């Protein structure tokens, strides 16, 4: 039973804790016995202050709740939501059975929608979100600065060893000390380099006010624009519908200063950005965000994606005249739609139809295969697990690499009318 419930990701936090302890404390043990250059008092205090800051920030990045969407939250503009749904901008999570605020995504690990989700970090076993992002940034900062300082101390001792390499061995450190120094240098250097690159990338994203997922969405949008140019500005969606693809500016880049302030909890106090015990952002925030006004404020992000539009709803085989005359038919149909939607969401329902990759569909259409367009757009091969949701950016990442539930982001059983979604929400 224990083996079945074990997941290797459960070792992430213990591994990081052991790594921090190894670098922070066994290094001091090495310095203590290194007679050629023992640890000075000011070096001792700096090392331990950095270690405390790293521990505090890492603990908070691991334990602070990444946030939840209030059960009673609904979009402020329902009329605009109707237009968004019609244009492929539906913000309804079929996993949570709730509306998704801007910048929220469904995390497959946390199993809920996360406000302003950046990614699910395996090393903290927690989502980096609107509420945990400041703690995550401070952890990266103090880890890079602390290990950078440790690197200078290790390099100083390594230089002493190298300078005395021609002296008799009994005049220098023992074999155990040399091995310890070598391991410390290698582990600290590699870890520092990896975290330094991650910190630079995170600072860049912070300055632009883009999450990791949104950077992926921006690159995806640019890819769709290139595809659409080949087809006169349009791409085909499910059922053969034509979707207009036009360039849309990222709406949340509001200036470097405002971007950094918003990402670090909303405070304009620069010192609080570096304070390990700084307060978590107010829990009432994270549902609405300031926009730059470059686009129509009613346009949502991400832009329309033909491969993220729900399948067109199936029509009942009954004439419009009979349907209009029979009110009970409408009530029964609505109840049946709600029940079918609930069954599909909670018990698996109908299997998800995955759209084939764009290039596969393009080649099939070009070759004029005998299948109809609606049939050839979707794959029935259960062994083909990667449809268009398997699209990767230039770095080889797809949405699931950031912890996002791809099925919840890309597919739905059918295009459920907004009225039915609202009624289903009230019945919960």
UniProtKB/Swiss-Prot annotation:
**Where can this protein be found?**
Endoplasmic reticulum membrane
In its keyword annotation, does this UniProt entry include Acyltransferase?
yes
Q: Report the transmembrane regions from the record.
A: 11-31, 44-61, 135-155, 178-198
Cite the PROSITE patterns for this sequence: DHHC
Keywords, alphabetical: Acyltransferase, Endoplasmic reticulum, Lipoprotein, Membrane, Palmitate, Transferase, Transmembrane, Transmembrane helix
Stretches assigned to the DHHC domain? 91-141
Described purpose of this protein according to its UniProt entry: Mediates the reversible addition of palmitate to target proteins, thereby regulating their membrane association and biological function.
**Similarity section:** Belongs to the DHHC palmitoyltransferase family. PFA4 subfamily.
Protein name per its UniProtKB record: Palmitoyltransferase pfa4
This chain is encoded by the gene named: pfa4
């Amino acid at each position: 039973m224990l083996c079945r419930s074990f997941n290797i990701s459960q070792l992430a936090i213990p591994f990081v804790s052991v790594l921090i302890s190894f670098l922070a404390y066994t290094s001091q043990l090495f310095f203590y016995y290194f007679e050629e250059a023992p640890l000075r008092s000011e070096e001792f205090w700096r090392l331990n202050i950095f270690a405390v800051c790293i521990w505090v920030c890492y603990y908070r990045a691991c334990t602070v709740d990444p946030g939840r969407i209030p059960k009673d939250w609904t979009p402020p503009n329902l009329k605009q939501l109707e237009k968004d749904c019609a244009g492929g901008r539906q913000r309804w999570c079929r996993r949570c059975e709730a509306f998704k605020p801007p910048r929220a995504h469904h995390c497959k690990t946390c199993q809920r929608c996360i406000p302003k989700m950046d990614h699910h970090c395996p090393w903290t076993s927690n989502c980096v979100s609107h509420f945990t992002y400041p703690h995550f940034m401070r952890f990266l900062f103090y880890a890079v600065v602390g290990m950078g300082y440790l690197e200078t101390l290790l390099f100083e001792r390594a230089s002493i060893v190298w300078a005395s390499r021609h002296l008799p061995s009994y005049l220098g450190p023992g074999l155990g000390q040399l091995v310890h120094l070598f391991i410390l240098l290698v582990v600290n250097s590699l870890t520092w380099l990896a975290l330094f690159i991650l910190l630079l990338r995170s600072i860049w994203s912070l300055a632009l006010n883009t999450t990791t997922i949104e950077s992926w969405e921006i690159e995806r949008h640019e890819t769709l624009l290139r595809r659409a140019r080949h087809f006169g500005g349009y791409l085909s969606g499910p059922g053969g519908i034509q979707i207009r693809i036009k360039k849309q500016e990222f709406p949340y880049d509001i200036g470097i200063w405002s971007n950094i302030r918003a990402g670090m909890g909303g405070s304009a106090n620069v010192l609080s950005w570096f304070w390990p015990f700084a307060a978590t952002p107010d829990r009432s925030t994270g549902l609405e965000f300031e926009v730059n006004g470059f686009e129509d404020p009613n346009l949502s992000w991400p832009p329309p994606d033909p491969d993220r539009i729900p399948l067109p709803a199936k029509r009942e085989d009954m004439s419009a005249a009979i349907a209009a005359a029979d009110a009970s038919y409408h009530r029964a149909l609505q109840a049946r739609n709600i029940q079918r939607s609930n069954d599909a969401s909670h018990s698996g329902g109908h299997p998800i139809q995955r759209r084939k990759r764009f290039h596969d569909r393009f080649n099939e259409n070009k070759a004029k295969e005998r299948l109809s367009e609606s049939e050839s757009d979707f794959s029935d091969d259960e062994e083909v697990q990667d449809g268009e949701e398997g699209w990767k950016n230039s770095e080889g990442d797809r949405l699931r690499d950031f912890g996002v539930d791809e099925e919840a982001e890309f597919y739905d059983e059918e295009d459920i009318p907004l009225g039915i979604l609202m009624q289903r929400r009230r019945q919960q």
